């Protein structure tokens, strides 16, 4: 039998052979097989930054600046002046102070992840982010972000934790008839698809609040009463210039 050669076209965006519109072909013979393969996109290089902190917070609230990445080649550093915060895993624990635990009351601890699109030279306070309004219940704050600040502050995630005191000091045995004490509470939350664009001063190698021009991420903790808190946060980010 005479030698025959089969000519078929191949599209790089598909694994199946289709018509001959692309101009690219695969020559199939009994002795050779030549393919024009589709190139694979290289995955993004994700860096990991872990930040841990603990302190005391009053009923005025506190704000912690999260993405203070310095410039460098390490996994906990930013690669350039633009970084993309992809996701975050946060572990937050709060506990009543001894004075609050000795009262028979229920308290609420509000928390939020907020991005500041116009950060200044110094760290903002809770009163700069939230405005308060009269509350129908004692020991409960009603707060909101003012309309003129909506373009500056955006809430990424938020929630609250409840704590209860039963009139006994922390560590005391419960007396009969006393309400249950809940002097400690915690959250373990993975926040994905954040995609926050963090822009730093190109002339600065530090990541402090004065060096970031856009995309400062804050952890806001606002309790009804003085508490102790501690958190560990793992942030996943990549180079925004790549």
Curated annotation (Swiss-Prot):
Gene3D superfamilies: 2.60.120.20. InterPro entries: GV_A/BR1_coat, Viral_coat. The keyword DNA-binding applies. GO terms for molecular function: DNA binding; structural molecule activity. Keywords: Capsid protein, DNA-binding, Host nucleus, T=1 icosahedral capsid protein, Viral penetration into host nucleus, Virion, Virus entry into host cell. It is found in: Virion; Host nucleus. It comes from the Viruses. One of its GO terms (cellular component) is host cell nucleus. GO terms for biological process: symbiont entry into host cell; viral penetration into host nucleus. A motif (Bipartite nuclear localization signal) lies at residues 1-42. The keyword Zinc-finger does not apply. Encapsidates the viral genome into characteristic twinned ('geminate') particles. Binds the genomic viral ssDNA and shuttles it into and out of the cell nucleus. Plays a role in protection of the genome from degradation, virus acquisition and transmission by insect vectors, infectivity, and systemic movement. The CP of monopartite geminiviruses is absolutely essential for virus movement. Belongs to the geminiviridae capsid protein family. Homomultimer. Binds to single-stranded and double-stranded viral DNA. Interacts (via nuclear localization signal) with host importin alpha-1a. This is Capsid protein. It comes from Tomato pseudo-curly top virus (TPCTV).
């Amino acid at each position: 039998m005479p030698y025959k050669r089969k000519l078929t076209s191949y599209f790089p965006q598909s694994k199946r052979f289709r018509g001959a519109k692309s101009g690219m072909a695969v020559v199939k013979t009994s002795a050779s097989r030549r393919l024009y393969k589709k190139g694979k996109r290289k995955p993004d290089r994700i860096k990991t930054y872990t930040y841990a902190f603990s302190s005391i917070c009053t009923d005025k609230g506190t704000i912690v600046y999260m993405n203070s990445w310095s410039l460098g080649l390490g996994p906990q550093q930013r690669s350039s002046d633009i970084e993309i915060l992809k996701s975050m895993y946060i572990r937050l624990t709060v506990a009543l102070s001894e004075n609050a635990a000795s009262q028979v009351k229920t308290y609420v601890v509000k928390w939020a992840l907020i991005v500041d699109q116009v950060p200044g030279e110094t760290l903002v306070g809770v009163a700069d982010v939230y405005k308060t309004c009269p509350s129908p219940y004692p020991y409960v704050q009603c707060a909101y972000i003012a309309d003129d600040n909506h373009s500056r502050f955006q809430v990424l995630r938020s929630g609250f934790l409840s704590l209860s005191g039963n009139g006994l000091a922390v560590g005391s045995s419960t007396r009969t008839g006393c309400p249950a004490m809940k002097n400690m509470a915690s959250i373990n939350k993975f926040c994905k698809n954040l995609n926050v664009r963090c822009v730093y001063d190109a002339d600065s190698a530090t990541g402090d609040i004065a060096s970031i021009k856009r995309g400062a991420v804050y952890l806001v903790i606002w309790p009804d009463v003085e508490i102790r808190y501690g958190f560990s946060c793992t942030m996943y980010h990549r180079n925004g210039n790549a």
